[in-house]
UniProtKB/Swiss-Prot annotation:
<comment type="function">
    <text>Catalyzes the hydrolysis of 1,4-dihydroxy-2-naphthoyl-CoA (DHNA-CoA) to 1,4-dihydroxy-2-naphthoate (DHNA), a reaction involved in phylloquinone (vitamin K1) biosynthesis.</text>
</comment>
<feature type="active site">
    <location>
        <position position="19"/>
    </location>
</feature>
<dbReference type="Pfam" id="PF13279">
    <property type="entry name" value="4HBT_2"/>
</dbReference>
<protein>
    <recommendedName>
        <fullName>1,4-dihydroxy-2-naphthoyl-CoA hydrolase</fullName>
        <ecNumber>3.1.2.28</ecNumber>
    </recommendedName>
</protein>
<comment type="pathway">
    <text>Cofactor biosynthesis; phylloquinone biosynthesis.</text>
</comment>
<dbReference type="GO" id="GO:0042372">
    <property type="term" value="P:phylloquinone biosynthetic process"/>
</dbReference>
<keyword id="KW-0378">Hydrolase</keyword>
<comment type="pathway">
    <text>Quinol/quinone metabolism; 1,4-dihydroxy-2-naphthoate biosynthesis; 1,4-dihydroxy-2-naphthoate from chorismate: step 7/7.</text>
</comment>
<dbReference type="GO" id="GO:0061522">
    <property type="term" value="F:1,4-dihydroxy-2-naphthoyl-CoA thioesterase activity"/>
</dbReference>
<dbReference type="InterPro" id="IPR029069">
    <property type="entry name" value="HotDog_dom_sf"/>
</dbReference>
<comment type="similarity">
    <text>Belongs to the 4-hydroxybenzoyl-CoA thioesterase family. DHNA-CoA hydrolase subfamily.</text>
</comment>
<dbReference type="InterPro" id="IPR022829">
    <property type="entry name" value="DHNA_CoA_hydrolase"/>
</dbReference>
Length: 150
């Protein structure tokens, strides 16, 4: 598998994603940013239940609350637009990681999102080290941060 397989995704803008002006509603950019990194780890080979807690089975003992997020809109994103979503994750320290998402339409960057997550124990809420699987995904992704496919 090539890094582009899990780092460059597609998103089609739907009617329900947009506001009355016909452009995406602002909160959807952060939603799409989060969904993109979730999809990316699954394509990479990490089952989502290994990362995100399922309270019925309690497989994961780690939670990743968002401690910072930003969205920048550089051009209108409208109904029917087909976007490439380029994911660029990196580790900040032992318990923090950041995922940048770049939204590209017709070869031009039209928006970007940034989400920073903190790794916490689900019960104590103490900061803990990022899980090995997530670290491997970040490392494998950073080997190819210069993807030219976009």
């Amino acid at each position: 598998m090539k890094p582009a397989d899990w780092l460059i995704l597609q998103k089609k803008v739907r009617f329900g994603d947009c506001d009355s002006a016909g452009v995406i509603h602002f909160h959807n950019l952060l939603k799409w940013s989060h969904e993109a990194w979730e999809e990316s780890i699954e394509i990479y080979g990490i089952p989502s239940q290994d990362i995100f807690p399922d309270f019925s089975i309690r497989k994961s003992q780690i939670i990743f609350p968002i401690v910072n997020c930003e969205a920048n809109f550089l051009a209108p994103i409208k109904i029917g637009d087909l976007l490439k979503v380029k994911i660029v994750p990196h580790k900040i320290n032992t318990h923090l990681f950041q995922v940048n998402s770049f939204f590209i339409k017709n070869g031009n960057k039209v928006a970007e999102g940034k989400i920073i997550h903190c790794s916490l124990d689900i019960d104590s809420r103490d900061k803990i080290e990022l899980p090995d699987q997530l670290e491997r995904w970040i490392e494998a992704s950073n080997v190819s941060t210069n993807l030219k496919e976009c």
